[in-house]
Amino acid sequence: MNLRGTRFAARDFEIRTFGLRNSGAEHATEVNVSGLAGFPLAKTAASFSRRKPRDWHDMAFALPHNDSGGTTAAIASARERFIGEMAALQTALDDLQANFQDSDARGSRAYVTQMRIDHPELNPEMLAADAVIAVEEFCRGVRNSAN
């Protein structure tokens, strides 16, 4: 259970409209999705408490691949939205960073494993390096705002 992280996701969401066509009829629905600040902070807590490879993958994927400007935008959003609250995540941030300390760390391997399933043509060494850099940059950026 991830009770520490859910508060970040619950307090930072946006409404997105998704459409589909079914039997020739257009349908649209609005869905609450976690925002750029809430998602990585919730995933940081989830990675620490659940230790599931999917959480590590999601974290490393969402940082550079979000629609708002990559890891730098995620850091800025988290710092702006949750200033003064990230000190509570310091242990989880330390743990996240340790799980991406190099290309052979558990988080890096989890990211590469899933990305190779989804995109077998991608170079595993480059994937691991991308994950290490993104997570390091995020941890350093949000940690600096907590001090």
Regions found by a protein language model. Give the residues of each.
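Compositionally biased terminal segments of proteins
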Residues: M1-N147
